[in-house]
Design a protein with these regions (language model features):
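A hydrophobic C-terminal alpha-helical subdomain
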Residues: 203-259
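Residues lining the SAM
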Residues: 50, 80, 246
Length: 259
């Protein structure tokens, strides 16, 4: 697909300058401005709705995009959700479930792409773990079947540019579910020193983050993600992502080395 066949709808055009330089048409619209969304979607056949990052506002924002797409005559929409969205205790899941349900009721032809965790989520911890030799989390014995952002992006592009995906719910995961002991080992391979996993309580996570300067509400949210991992919310392994991209998914070690 040529860049000129792609439209990127963004809130800040400056942040899409690299896309514009490649020949992608950049249009500006805010999630809250349904009129602008409708105008931005004129002439668009397929939409990729990447879930927003404003927790607590996400469903309303997603709903506006779905409504605008319907009004603009969009033929198909793919939405990036989360693993086990309809049964997950992950605090991120409820708004994804609401969006999935709203999309299903909209009448739009669609595909749900339930993305597992990103390996890149661990990159920011690398300096501290290299110094301490400890990976502390309230994830218990839970496992995470993460993949790289490029893996998810390549799989998504395949769905958008090939036929046969309408009405499907794809669980996009890495090829392997890693325990936090496995994740600690991956850190060790990259740092060249032993890294051990130290299970802690959710209260410990909150206390450590508050001490580091994070507000208590956000710290509690992060701790709740940890405890949901302990409950198995991200342990699902499905082969569909690897099948679509035609290769093994990227390893955590490779992503950490690229940090």
């Amino acid at each position: 697909m040529a860049p000129s066949d792609v439209v990127a709808i963004v809130r800040d055009a400056d942040k899409a300058a690299d896309l514009a330089a490649k020949g992608v048409e950049v249009r500006v619209a805010d999630y809250a401005d349904t009129d602008a969304l409708g105008k931005a979607l004129v002439g668009v056949d397929k939409v990729l709705l990447i879930s927003s990052n404003e927790v607590g506002q996400r469903f309303a924002q997603h709903r506006n995009v779905i409504d605008a797409a319907t009004s603009a005559g969009v033929l198909y929409l793919a939405y990036t959700s989360i693993t086990k969205a309809t049964e997950s205790s992950n605090p991120l899941a409820p708004e994804h479930q609401q969006t999935e349900e709203y999309l299903a009721a909209s009448g739009l032809a669609h595909t749900v792409l339930r993305n597992n965790w990103y390996h890149e989520n661990y990159q920011a911890q690398l300096p501290a773990i290299a110094e301490s030799g400890v990976l502390a989390a309230a994830a218990g014995d839970g496992k995470v079947a993460a993949a790289s952002r490029k893996d998810f992006a390549d799989g998504t592009a395949k769905v958008l540019t090939t036929d046969g995906h309408e009405g499907k719910v794809y669980e996009f995961t890495g090829d392997t579910a890693l325990s936090y002991a496995d994740i600690a080992d991956a850190f060790g391979q990259v740092t060249g020193s032993e890294v051990v996993y130290q299970p802690v309580t959710a209260a410990d996570v909150v206390a450590a983050m508050v001490q580091a300067g994070l507000d208590e509400e956000t710290a509690g949210f992060v701790a709740a993600i940890d405890t949901s991992i302990a409950e198995g919310t991200l342990d699902l392994v499905d082969s569909i992502l690897g099948q679509l991209i035609g290769r093994p998914t990227t390893t955590l070690v490779d992503v950490l080395r690229a940090a």
